[in-house]
Amino acid sequence: MLTMVGLTPAEDRSEIAFFDVETTIPFRVGQGYAILEFGSILVCPKKLVELKNYSVLVRPANLNLITPRSVKCNGIKREDVESALTFADIADTVYDILHGRIWAGHNILKFDCPRIREAFAEIGRDPPEPKGTIDSLALLTQRFGRRAGDMKMATLATYFGLGNQTHRSLDDVRMNFEVLKYCATVLFLESSLPDELIENSVTTTTPETSSRRRRTIKKSPLQSPTDQQTGENMTTIPILSFVSSAEAQTDPFDMSTLRNEIAPEVLQSDVPMEEEQNQQSETVASEGTGDQEGFMELDKISVSSIRATHVPLYDGSQTMKLQLFLGDRPLQLHCPRLKVRFGINGKFMDKAGRRRLNFVIDLYPSLCNVLQECDSAAQTISVDSGSGSDWNPLVIPMKGFLNCPTARIHIPTELNGDIDRYAAEIHQKEFSGATATQKLISSNPKAEEIESLLNPRTVLDAFLSLEPYDYQQRAGIRLVARKLVIH
């Protein structure tokens, strides 16, 4: 069996396993990823030093999955892996490195962890399981803020002067470890400084950034209850305060063991962090959506008529955007009687310092079918047009909650003259005998007003636009509320 450099037979598995996989890039809908390289280092959580390392190229079952797009991404060519070991050959070593340890990496919950589980499933073996996870993308987005830009590993490395990202597993793992140490050091220093020094030394997006950052350091949903109560663990082993429980993270989409109050935090971490900043289609003239013309009833939609195509961003533009149609009509949905699963989550800010508002709703079967067909149509066109971005599914599986799928609805911001506002109209449904009417509550609601209305279990009618995006290697469809009618 392959051995890890420095591996000893007797170990307490207290080390943190930083790992990364390099893969092929799917070029058609339904195609999976194939692992081309696995790299890992084991880190002492007390001294933050690398103890052991392992890196290996992997030969996929189908070498034709290695395309020019994947070579451009990671530099791994067909000839590099033709004589390499298969994943089945290295599975014992990978299992021994990962199982029962804390896993760490950048965006591992959405990418690397699923790839490991898929690879073990393909060879008919149970996958390794972590005792905790540290996803530096979600962690640093929450704690370090947007001062380093888009929070991609290459951007963070540039911010700290660590050189260029090679997109090779062992190099990326070591870079991830260094970035995490740098960020942790900055946050530790900031937690000890007066507010006015932090305000003078850190570029902020809102006046609340400093105090919010200090509150986050003191108490975070990623921090264990013991840390929050006593601070003892954070004093002895600071990096362990970053660990999320394995119970909550075994499956990045399995929320069955989470408490309802922390579930919105987990769901929020899946949001592409700035895609709406580059979707110019969101900034439109102020118009009322009080009439329902153009929004289609679900029972009148034939999923076979849903299509996606590229259209000009605006009349006369040479820039193209992806748009969904039902036949020849732009697809917009009228969705009655939606139930709110998780209320407004507005902890992230856009570049203008405004809270980004979204909430999660349960999907009934007819709506779920329409959204899945939209996802499939848009992803097909995206892949066919040469996009190598990771696709974020529109429908979110929610195992453990009667297996009811969910989706996230975004509240847009729009420019009306010189005034920024939240653009979804909010109405209240009122009944007089057998007659139902809609009373306009606000056409430019404040964040606090929206937050107070959209509580869990609230029932509402939603008038939604579907807005595909492809930004910073993340692509998908956003459901955007144009009008909400509260029951």
Curated annotation (Swiss-Prot):
GO cellular component, one term: cytoplasm
Assigned EC number: 3.1.11.-
Tissue: Expressed in the sieve elements and phloem pole pericycle cells.
CDD domains reported in the protein's UniProt record: DEDDh
Positions that bind Mg(2+) 1: D20, E22, D172
Domain of life: Eukaryota
Cytoplasm is among the record's keywords: yes
Protein name: Protein NEN2
Protein's organism: Arabidopsis thaliana (Mouse-ear cress)
Lineage: Eukaryota, Viridiplantae, Streptophyta, Embryophyta, Tracheophyta
